[in-house]
UniProtKB/Swiss-Prot annotation:
NCBIfam families: GAPDH-II_archae (TIGR01546), PRK04207.1 (NF003251). It comes from Methanococcoides burtonii (strain DSM 6242 / NBRC 107633 / OCM 468 / ACE-M). The active site is at residue 141. This is Glyceraldehyde-3-phosphate dehydrogenase. NAD(+) binds at residues 13-14, 111, 169, 300. D-glyceraldehyde 3-phosphate binds at residues 140-142, 195-196. Belongs to the glyceraldehyde-3-phosphate dehydrogenase family. It is found in: Cytoplasm. One of its GO terms (biological process) is lysine biosynthetic process via diaminopimelate. Homotetramer. Gene3D superfamilies: Dihydrodipicolinate Reductase, domain 2 (3.30.360.10), NAD(P)-binding Rossmann-like Domain (3.40.50.720).
């Protein structure tokens, strides 16, 4: 089998995880990663055997720190079939001209606007839309988490109205620059938040409004979900539908917080302690006065990683069937 050659432009929180996931696949391979600074992540990439590329004016800085560079970002892109852009939000959009000139397919992350690609992706929801596409955007961690539950519930019962409050972590664990440290911040203060419109880029028909708050924690996001459904159903009916979703994990057994979910991920032996699935407290699934309520937790560093793998497979037309691609990705990653 000829493997698809994948380049990773940006090797931070998402990029390094996507690189590791690609390396697990039988139908794709990493031809290089791009970093702009000679930090510990760059050294780790070399230790893993990845070819390191950088900007032309950064080659000297890399070599000064003893990091062998395989070439420039432009050279990496020319050698690839598809590039996964994991550069910081709003930076990735500036790379589109570079990819277009190279005639290469590209995937961006949720920090970029939907208009950049015209195709926002979630594997379980709209895999077919990305088949053969040149440019695709994998939606953010929060939007991914919402699509994973709203899509199957909409198909089964019809979602008449969705109202979601997102309790967002303030920063990733390794981020020392972002806050708040000792405050609760309505973000944004003017409602609704951007998450609802972002969900609609994947599920256009859904009526959804979202509000969001930033909290002084680094571990996960928490969603409080309230749905008005078109068909009558019980909490048990909802639980049965969600139980069939391969990227949804029910939590209980004494787990009452995001801290304990992260501990569970470590106990499962997950790489970096990642939790790729939505974590739903199935005990929270409740029908109250005809409306559905439940809580779910989203690991912001990792839930989009399997989605990037499925996006590659769809764009390169390695697999036309969404369920088959999801099955392959889940098996290789241990989901």
């Amino acid at each position: 089998m000829t493997k698809v050659k994948v380049a990773i432009n940006g090797y931070g929180t998402i990029g390094k995880r996507v690189a590791d996931a690609v390396a697990l696949q039988d139908d794709m391979e990493i031809i290089g990663i791009a970093k702009t600074r000679p930090n510990f992540e760059t050294v780790m990439a070399k230790d893993k055997g990845f070819n390191v590329y950088t900007l032309a004016d950064r080659v000297g800085a890399m070599e000064k720190e003893g990091i062998e560079v395989s070439g420039t970002v432009e050279e990496m892109i020319k050698a690839a079939d598809v590039v996964v852009d994991c550069t910081p939000g709003k930076v990735g959009a500036t790379n589109k001209d570079l990819y277009e000139k190279a005639g290469i397919k590209a995937i961006w992350q949720g920090g970029e606007a939907h208009t950049l690609t015209g195709c926002s992706f979630n594997a379980e929801t709209n895999y077919d839309e990305a088949l053969g596409k040149d440019f695709v955007r994998v939606v953010s961690c929060n939007t991914t988490g919402l699509c994973r539950v709203l899509s199957p519930l909409d198909k089964e019962f019809g979602v008449k109205k969705a109202r979601v409050t997102l309790l967002r972590r303030a920063a990733d664990p390794g981020d020392i620059k972002t806050g708040p440290i000792n405050a609760i911040v309505p973000n944004p203060i003017k409602l609704p938040s951007h998450h609802g419109p972002d969900v609609k880029t994947v599920i256009p028909n859904i009526d959804i409004a979202t509000t969001a708050v930033k909290l002084p924690t680094t571990l996960m996001h928490l969603h409080t979900i309230n749905l008005e459904l078109e068909k009558e159903c019980t909490a048990e009916d909802v639980e049965s539908v969600l139980a069939e979703q391969s990227r949804v994990r029910f939590v209980g057994q004494g787990i009452t917080s995001t801290a304990e979910i992260m501990e569970l991920a470590k106990d499962l032996g997950r790489s970096r302690g990642d939790m790729w699935e939505n974590c739903i407290w199935n005990e929270s699934i409740t029908m109250y006065e005809g409306e559905l309520y439940f809580f779910q937790a989203i690991h912001q560093e990792s839930d989009v990683i399997p989605e990037n793998i499925d996006a590659i497979r769809a764009m390169m037309e390695l697999e036309s069937d969404a369920s088959r691609s999801i099955e392959i990705t889940n098996k290789t990653m241990g989901i």
